[in-house]
Amino acid sequence: MTMARNWRDIRADAVAQGRVDLQRAAVAREEMRDAVLAHRLAEIRKALGHARQADVAALMGVSQARVSKLESGDLSHTELGTLQAYVAALGGHLRIVAEFGENTVELTA
C-alpha cells in the first residue's frame, strides 16, 4: 500500500532532482503578482470613466504605449514618477509604506 506524501516532501524531492527551480518560481510569482495588480489598475481606470488609455496618457504627458505597458504588468520596472502620474491622472493619491520589522514609515509621493 502506498502512503500519501505531504506536499513539503514532494516539493523537496522535486527541487533536489532539479525538476523545480525555486528562483524561477519566485520570479514567476512576482510577474503574476505584477500582472494581477496591473489588471486591477486598468479595471479602476475603466470604472472611473477613463475608457481609453490614450486619454489617461494625455493627462500624464506620456504615450498610450507607456500606459499600456504599465497596465500589462510592467510594474516592477515602472519609475515611481510614472506610477504617481498614472494614479494622479485617475484622481488618486499614491502612498508608499516602508516596513522595518515593527517600524513603518509612510512616504507620500
Curated annotation (Swiss-Prot):
UniProt key word Transcription regulation: yes
Reported function: Putative antitoxin component of a type II toxin-antitoxin (TA) system. Its cognate toxin would be HigB3.
Example GO molecular function: DNA binding
Binding region for DNA: 53-72
HTH cro/C1-type domain boundaries: 41-97
Signal peptide: none
Alphabetized SMART domains for the sequence: HTH_XRE
Protein name: Putative antitoxin HigA3
Taxonomic lineage: Bacteria, Bacillati, Actinomycetota, Actinomycetes, Mycobacteriales
Keywords from the named record: DNA-binding, Toxin-antitoxin system, Transcription, Transcription regulation
Source organism superkingdom: Bacteria
Disulfide pairings: none
